[in-house]
From Swiss-Prot:
EC number(s) per entry: 3.2.1.67
Annotated positions binding Mn(2+): C179, H216
Name recorded for this polypeptide: Alpha-galacturonidase
Alphabetical GO biological process terms: carbohydrate metabolic process
Enzymatic class: hydrolase
Species of origin: Thermoanaerobacterium saccharolyticum (strain DSM 8691 / JW/SL-YS485)
Binding sites annotated in the UniProt record for substrate: N157
Lineage top rank: taxon: Bacteria
Functional summary from the UniProt entry: Alpha-galacturonidase able to catalyze the hydrolysis of the chromogenic substrate p-nitrophenyl-alpha-D-galacturonic acid (pNPalphaGalUA). It is probable that alpha-1,4-di-galacturonate (GalUA(2)) is the naturally occurring substrate.
Co-factor remark: Binds 1 Mn(2+) ion per subunit.
Known partners and oligomeric status: Homotetramer.
Molecular function per GO: galacturan 1,4-alpha-galacturonidase activity; metal ion binding; oxidoreductase activity, acting on the CH-OH group of donors, NAD or NADP as acceptor
Names of the cofactor(s): NAD(+); Mn(2+)
Binding residues annotated for NAD(+), in chain numbering: 11-78
């Protein structure tokens, strides 16, 4: 890398999952709008053609006169080729295909278990983790061999176990996980400020919060805007909208978009515990007993959120594949929209181009009390020149921490089971999940069925009869 006049040149970014039609395009967008950094993005994907398509799309974007950030995109045929010489590594992969995810999400429905996402916890999240962890073992070993000093940014779910695996295999790795769920809660606090106090259009970055918890089950126990206590403002907001829910856009709401909610799960958790649940309702609902919010589709509708079906994801993939073709041929112009992501800002800060405080997922080295040392937790952290320091965030209320700890220990059990290829250990995590409220006999039948549906990613496993 070269530093000149407040800019950094010749940076090398390895992108694992470089054929992505979502996260990769977001990265291209944010790099294109940032003139202070430039270099090469090496795209690796098990689908080389997809990575090559993104090479064409990215290089066409870089040549445009309206683009400030100039990057060379290069598709790589092997993981090793992409990692050699990398200063940063970005991991954004789909572990398996949507066929496996279809089993993760929908096989449990035969037993009355409903999941709104199915990629983090619940039966789907656990089985997804069992096939993801071996992939991250390989990635960690490759990083250790080819670019041990690189900063590693993970976007893949299950976030906690992906990051945890990287550190288990390569303890000296400089890795962290990024998730935008907390950003949505900052935006909700901004809307509460407008609704209750009449203060309009406050950017989420000006909403100062203390974050603590685990990914997708993150909490805020202190929130301020200048001298205004937003915990008090939020309480009034929750009391006002608890029954009706809060809908910010009538044309894009929980009834016509399964990714959107009316925030009623979030509001209910606040009234129960007095701290703000800082993730989308679809994720939060999966961390607590299933009969709270996910008893059945009717209950889900009462709480005003949606069950995201894998059939929808498959249709969406078809649309993105068609868009990829249009972008590749130039039939469609690549629009530089706001992505809402912070990866490029984090890279800049690590390069010494200004400090940044934001939420990330890292091993617990004392930043949260009451959670085991080494478990991956989500808190704020300070990014500065080649340094990342988690912010001391205190302790969750005991009644919240008991919910979090159940998931932490389950995640640790899942990791051990995946590394040992231990059916019984994995099943013990499966039946301990709050969504699995069926009999042991039915739970074992379901578990075996789900493992059978993902067995091509479970090398060395013996699925018991």
């Amino acid at each position: 890398m070269r530093y000149t006049d407040g800019k950094v040149h010749d940076i090398t970014i390895a992108y694992i999952g470089g054929g992505s039609r979502g996260w990769a395009w977001n990265l291209m967008t944010d790099l294109a709008k940032e003139e202070s950094i430039s270099g090469t993005v090496k795209l690796y994907d098990i689908d080389y053609d997809a990575a090559h398509d993104n090479e064409i799309i990215g290089n066409a974007l870089s040549m445009r006169q309206d683009v400030k950030g100039k990057w060379l995109y290069k598709a790589c045929e092997t993981l090793e080729e992409s990692l050699k010489g990398a200063d940063f590594v970005i991991i954004s992969i789909l572990p398996g295909t949507f066929d496996e995810m279809e089993s993760d999400v929908h096989a449990p429905e035969k037993y009355g278990i409903y999941q709104s996402v199915g990629d983090t916890v619940g039966p789907g999240g656990i089985v997804r983790a069992l096939r993801t962890i071996p992939m991250f073992v390989d990635i960690a070993n490759a990083i250790k061999e080819h670019c041990p000093d690189a900063w590693v940014i993970n976007y893949t779910n299950p976030m906690t176990l992906c990051v945890r695996t990287l550190y288990e295999i390569f303890p000296q790795i400089k890795a962290f996980g990024c998730c935008h769920e907390v950003f949505g809660t900052q935006k909700l606090l901004s809307r509460a400020l407008q609704d209750i106090e009449g203060i309009e259009n406050v950017p989420r970055e000006e909403i100062k919060i203390n974050v603590l918890g685990i990914n997708h089950f993150t909490w805020i126990d202190n929130a301020r805007y200048k001298d205004i206590d937003l915990m008090y403002v939020y309480k009034q907001f929750v009391n006002k909208y608890y029954e009706s829910g809060f809908v910010s856009d009538a044309n894009n709401n929980w009834m016509n978009n399964s990714f959107v909610s009316a925030e009623r799960v979030k509001f209910d958790l606040f009234l129960r515990y007095g701290v703000i649940a800082a993730a989308g309702d679809r994720h939060l609902a999966e961390f607590v007993p299933g009969y709270w919010y996910l008893k059945d589709p009717e209950t889900v509708r009462e709480w005003m959120f949606g069950l995201t079906t894998v059939s929808w994801r498959k249709e969406d993939l078809k649309r993105r594949l068609e868009r990829s073709k249009r972008l590749k041929t130039g039939e469609e112009k690549f629009e530089l929209k706001e992505t809402g992501e912070e990866g490029v800002r984090q890279i800049k800060a690590l390069l010494g181009l200004g400090d940044l405080v934001t939420n990330v997922n890292m091993p617990n080295h004392g930043q949260i009390e009451g959670i085991p040392y080494g478990a991956v937790v989500e808190t704020n952290a300070l990014f500065s020149g080649n340094k990342l320091k988690p912010v001391l965030s205190g302790k969750l209320p005991d009644n919240v921490n008991s919910l979090v700890l159940r998931q932490v220990y389950n995640q640790e059990t899942t990791l051990k089971a995946a590394l040992k290829r231990d059916f019984d250990l994995a099943f013990s995590a499966f039946v301990n999940d709050p969504l699995v409220t069926i009999s042991l006999k039915d739970a074992k039948k379901l578990f075996k069925e789900m493992l059978e549906n993902t067995k091509k990613y479970l090398d060395g496993w013996k699925i018991k009869a």
